[in-house]
């Protein structure tokens, strides 16, 4: 008989479309850094394509806000119990990698701690924005933290957690693969006419509270720009036919696309976007935008008391100032949003000032190589515990 090492099994959990993409790049990088790693867990189409065994679709869990979470609680609770059982079972993973999705993932990290499974958190909770006191809770259940912003490590100084700044994952993923005019012609659109991007988000509750406002803003915008064309990319968490059905009643010339996101952004003269990771993607391309944020009134009232930063859009947070306008809750009206996009399209000096501010965001996001750094951290974390071996 001889000993044969089994592949290290890594559980990965994310509930966001952006996390699905980051997870996919991590898995691909891990294949080069340590081919002995295999991945399973919660994610989407991107992670599945990269070779991850998807036990629970991430889109089933992707909700934001207290009221919204309560509405999806049975589904979320079933998923949590399933993962908890695996962590405490005979086939428990060699490590747990958590990507964003803070509240769910911190509960899962606590279970991993009890089960003796080491935990790495990638795209960690935004403690710099709200509920900063969570750093102690995070340090108590997470072994290693891959920080994507340079100001994050200092938040954990003096705590028993290994924090490493790895850079932002979007820098690894950034690529424009098709020139603007060629891209638009391939979609049957006219490159000589203005193109507006409509980005209503990747979560179900974002569609519920924000999509209508964004589409109504597009209707309003056509009063001044009747020749405008609209692009709406489909997030990996949704089906194309569902988005097309959502758009149809508005009578807009919207082309719903399942194309590389940076090609879509590059084709746009302006973008109306939700407040999350996509604002950083738009910033990397340098396209001027307006940020829209709406949620259930009770969730917003609670969140407003907890948030510590003056801006809600990630692009503005990274810039440290209001580079692009934010339209939040009651201020998120079609009239105000369409007026901002009109200014972007017609005021050349204003347009240039926004692009200059977005260049600041690009500079502050650091350098590429994030996925490889995190893959190395995962491999190291696994080597810190005895390898599973079987006799044959």
Swiss-Prot record:
Single GO molecular function: lipid-A-disaccharide synthase activity
Keyword Cytoplasm tagged: no
UniProt keyword terms in alphabetical order: Glycosyltransferase, Lipid A biosynthesis, Lipid biosynthesis, Lipid metabolism, Transferase
One of the GO biological process terms: lipid A biosynthetic process
InterPro entries: Glyco_trans_19
Record's catalysed reaction(s): a lipid X + a UDP-2-N,3-O-bis[(3R)-3-hydroxyacyl]-alpha-D-glucosamine = a lipid A disaccharide + UDP + H(+)
Pfam families assigned to the protein according to its UniProt record, in alphabetical order: LpxB (PF02684)
Protein origin, superkingdom: Bacteria
Claim: Ribonucleoprotein is one of the keywords in the record: no
GO cellular component, one term: membrane
The protein's annotated pathway: Bacterial outer membrane biogenesis; LPS lipid A biosynthesis
EC id: 2.4.1.182
Family: Belongs to the LpxB family.
Record function comment: Condensation of UDP-2,3-diacylglucosamine and 2,3-diacylglucosamine-1-phosphate to form lipid A disaccharide, a precursor of lipid A, a phosphorylated glycolipid that anchors the lipopolysaccharide to the outer membrane of the cell.
Protein name per UniProt: Lipid-A-disaccharide synthase
Organism in which the protein naturally occurs: Syntrophotalea carbinolica (strain DSM 2380 / NBRC 103641 / GraBd1)
High-level lineage: Bacteria, Pseudomonadati, Thermodesulfobacteriota, Desulfuromonadia, Desulfuromonadales
């Amino acid at each position: 008989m001889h000993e044969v090492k089994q592949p290290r099994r890594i559980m990965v959990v994310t509930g966001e479309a952006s996390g699905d993409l980051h997870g996919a790049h991590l898995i691909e990088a891990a294949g080069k850094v340590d081919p002995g790693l295999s991945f399973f867990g919660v994610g989407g189409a991107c992670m599945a394509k990269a070779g991850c065994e998807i036990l629970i679709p991430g889109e089933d869990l992707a909700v934001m806000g207290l009221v919204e979470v309560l509405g999806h609680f049975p589904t979320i609770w079933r998923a949590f119990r399933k993962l908890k059982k695996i962590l405490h079972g005979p086939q428990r993973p060699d490590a747990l990698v958590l990507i964003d999705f803070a509240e769910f993932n911190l509960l899962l990290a606590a279970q991993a701690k009890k089960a003796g499974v080491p935990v790495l958190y990638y795209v960690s909770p935004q403690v710099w924005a709200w509920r900063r006191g969570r750093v102690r809770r995070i340090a108590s259940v997470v072994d290693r933290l891959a920080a994507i912003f340079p100001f994050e490590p200092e938040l954990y100084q003096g705590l028993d957690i290994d924090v490493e700044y790895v850079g932002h994952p979007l820098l690894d993923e950034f690529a424009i693969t098709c020139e603007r005019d060629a891209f638009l012609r391939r979609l049957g659109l006219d490159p000589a006419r203005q193109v507006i991007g409509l980005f209503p988000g990747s979560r179900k509750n974002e569609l519920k509270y924000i999509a209508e406002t964004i589409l109504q803003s597009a209707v309003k915008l056509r009063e001044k720009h009747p020749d405008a064309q609209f692009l709406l990319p489909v997030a990996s968490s949704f089906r194309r036919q569902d988005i097309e059905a959502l758009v149809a009643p508005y009578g807009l010339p919207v082309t719903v696309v399942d194309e590389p996101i940076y090609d879509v952004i590059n084709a746009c003269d302006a973008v109306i976007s939700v407040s999350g990771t996509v604002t950083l993607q738009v910033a990397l391309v340098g396209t001027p935008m307006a940020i829209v944020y709406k949620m259930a009134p009770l969730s917003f009232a609670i969140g407003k008391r907890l948030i510590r930063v003056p801006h809600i859009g990630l692009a503005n947070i990274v810039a440290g100032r209001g580079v692009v306008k934010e339209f939040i809750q009651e201020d998120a009206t079609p009239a105000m949003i369409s007026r901002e996009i009109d200014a972007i399209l017609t005021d050349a000096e204003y347009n240039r000032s926004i692009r200059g501010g977005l260049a600041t965001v690009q500079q502050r996001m650091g350098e590429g190589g994030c996925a490889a750094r995190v893959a190395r951290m995962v491999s190291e974390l696994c080597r810190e515990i005895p390898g599973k071996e079987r006799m044959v």
